[in-house]
């Protein structure tokens, strides 16, 4: 399956569910307490992160999608911290604050990135998250996906009202389920239990065949649009009526902390579906995102640049021959990491030592080098009959194999001016003995503040001379 980056900015999502604050006390441990056989942690830093449904909304916003959140909190300092964090991340949060009841807080005591202890501050809420004076229809206005983030803490008490209201508007409903009664999610477009949650409902599964069979029965009984079972190191299994099961292997390179991985899955799914992606593609993106987030410490969000880079790596486009869409994604990701983009162009028909030296010098002008080459018809117009000697595919393959070159792209026009307008490199480099103002595209690059540099050519290195020498020897 070919992966691509969705248009998350056009994908508004509403999250309703159990809001909590994940609080971390970071410190170091160097001795045992004289009072009891326990380590003493000297706290050096206190960190707050949105958790539960708030983490789902945060993940959606981090991908660039408009995110709204409805939940219940106490009327306390923890709720203030949550509100400030979410506002800073661009999440529109609507909290019902309950006096004399604490916001749910999960406090983790950390020593050198190892969790020593977790302390929970919570009382189940008896109040409906939607007792805000707002109507369900108003909340769903303009929304493309509804997420029910259920941690069984009492904020979600009206599953069916929400599901039916969304279905009436044609809005998909995604639910991250909890508890032993999945009937409350009847009619949802997709539910995303982990394996233990799934088996608590359907019974143990000896193998994938049994998982698929029991999953199909569950979908039928609950009128579900689809079922995604997350299976840890075994990846994910997507089940849909009248479709074969889709098994996706785990993508994690290194598992550091699984906290919040389920939130990342459902948030990526929601944002991708809201952006118009088909379910299998959305699941593949969620699988990729989960593989990234488990490599982070604690409750964490995945950013759009991180997902882009993972897609590029998956599609083999982190380096090499790219189309324009892939190149623009790669450039955006590089810029997100403060990398300087260098651009050069040419025919590069027969690659020689002069080319290699020139490209190494060009790469030294920044962090990433794009080489744009004329396609075959363009070379023929410029160089005359009998050229190019090598086809555009072969020329790009050779260039992509050079250590100095990050990305190679072809263009059909006589000049790369259209590419320059799209890519907007930080530096345009050309080899030759002419002035900067004579470089094709210099005016385009200088207009937006980019730099133009001319590098000298290596003497006695010429493709035309090589071609003539070969012809004379025949």
Swiss-Prot record:
Gene3D superfamilies in alphabetical order: 3.40.1190.20, HUPs (3.40.50.620)
CDD domains xrefs: RfaE_like
Pathway participation: Nucleotide-sugar biosynthesis; ADP-L-glycero-beta-D-manno-heptose biosynthesis; ADP-L-glycero-beta-D-manno-heptose from D-glycero-beta-D-manno-heptose 7-phosphate: step 1/4; Nucleotide-sugar biosynthesis; ADP-L-glycero-beta-D-manno-heptose biosynthesis; ADP-L-glycero-beta-D-manno-heptose from D-glycero-beta-D-manno-heptose 7-phosphate: step 3/4
Binding site for ATP: 194-197
Molecular function terms, GO-annotated: ATP binding; heptose 7-phosphate kinase activity; heptose-1-phosphate adenylyltransferase activity; phosphotransferase activity, alcohol group as acceptor
Catalytic residue positions: 263
CC annotations in GO: cytosol
Reaction catalysed by this enzyme: D-glycero-beta-D-manno-heptose 7-phosphate + ATP = D-glycero-beta-D-manno-heptose 1,7-bisphosphate + ADP + H(+); D-glycero-beta-D-manno-heptose 1-phosphate + ATP + H(+) = ADP-D-glycero-beta-D-manno-heptose + diphosphate
Top-level division of the source organism's lineage: Bacteria
A Gene Ontology biological process term: ADP-L-glycero-beta-D-manno-heptose biosynthetic process
Location of region: Ribokinase: 1-318
The keyword Nucleotide-binding belongs to this UniProt entry's keyword annotation: yes
PROSITE patterns linked to this entry: PFKB_KINASES_1
Region (Cytidylyltransferase): 343-474
InterPro entries, alphabetized: Bifunc_HldE, Carboh/pur_kinase_PfkB_CS, Cyt_trans-like, PfkB_dom, RfaE_dom_I, RfaE_dom_II, Ribokinase-like, Rossmann-like_a/b/a_fold
Assembly and interaction partners: Homodimer.
Family: In the N-terminal section; belongs to the carbohydrate kinase PfkB family.
PANTHER family: BIFUNCTIONAL PROTEIN HLDE
Protein name, entry field: Bifunctional protein HldE
Naturally occurring in which organism (per UniProt): Pseudomonas fluorescens (strain Pf0-1)
């Amino acid at each position: 399956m070919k992966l691509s980056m969705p248009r998350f900015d056009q994908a508004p999502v509403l999250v309703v569910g159990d809001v909590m604050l994940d609080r971390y006390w970071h410190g170091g441990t160097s001795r045992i307490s004289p009072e009891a056989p326990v380590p003493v942690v000297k706290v050096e830093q206190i960190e707050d992160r949105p958790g539960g449904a708030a983490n789902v909304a945060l993940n959606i916003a981090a991908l660039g999608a408009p995110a709204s959140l409805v939940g219940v909190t106490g009327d306390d300092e923890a709720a203030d911290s949550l509100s400030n964090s979410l506002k800073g991340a661009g999440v529109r949060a609507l909290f019902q604050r309950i006096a004399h009841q604490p916001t749910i807080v999960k406090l983790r005591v950390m020593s050198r990135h190892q969790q020593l202890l977790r302390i929970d501050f919570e009382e189940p809420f008896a109040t409906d998250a939607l007792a805000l004076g707002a109507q369900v229809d108003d909340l769903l206005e303009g929304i493309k996906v509804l997420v029910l983030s259920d941690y069984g803490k009492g904020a979600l008490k009206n599953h069916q009202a929400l599901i039916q209201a969304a279905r009436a508007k044609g809005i998909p409903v995604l639910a991250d389920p909890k508890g032993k009664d999945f009937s409350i999610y009847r009619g949802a477009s997709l539910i995303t239990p982990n394996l233990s949650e799934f088996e608590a409902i359907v019974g143990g599964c000896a193998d994938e065949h049994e998982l698929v069979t029991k999953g199909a029965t569950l979908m039928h009984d609950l009128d579900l649009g689809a079922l995604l079972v997350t299976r840890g190191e075994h990846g994910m299994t997507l089940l849909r009526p009248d479709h074969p099961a889709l098994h996706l292997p785990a993508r994690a390179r290194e598992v550091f902390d699984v906290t919040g991985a389920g939130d990342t899955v459902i948030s990526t799914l929601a944002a991708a579906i809201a952006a118009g992606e088909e379910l299998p593609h959305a699941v593949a993106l969620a699988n990729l995102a989960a593989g990234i987030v488990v490599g982070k410490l604690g409750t964490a969000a995945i950013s759009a640049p991180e997902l882009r880079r993972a897609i590029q790596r998956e599609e083999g486009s982190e380096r090499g021959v790219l189309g324009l869409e892939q190149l623009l994604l790669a450039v955006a990701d590089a810029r997100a990491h403060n990398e300087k983009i260098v651009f050069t162009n040419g025919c590069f028909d027969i690659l020689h030592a002069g080319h290699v030296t020139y490209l190494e010098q060009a790469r030294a002008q920044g962090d990433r080098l794009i080489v744009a080459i004329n396609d075959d018809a363009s070379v023929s117009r410029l160089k005359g009959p009998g050229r190019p000697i090598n086809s555009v595919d072969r020329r790009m393959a050779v260039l992509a194999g050079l250590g100095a070159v990050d990305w190679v792209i072809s263009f059909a026009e006589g000049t790369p001016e259209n590419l320059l307008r799209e890519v907007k490199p930080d530096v345009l480099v050309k080899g030759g003995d002419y002035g900067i103002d004579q470089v094709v595209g210099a005016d385009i690059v200088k207009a937006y503040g980019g730099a133009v540099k001319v590098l000298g050519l290596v003497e006695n290195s010429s493709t035309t001379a090589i071609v003539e020498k070969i012809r004379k020897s025949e």
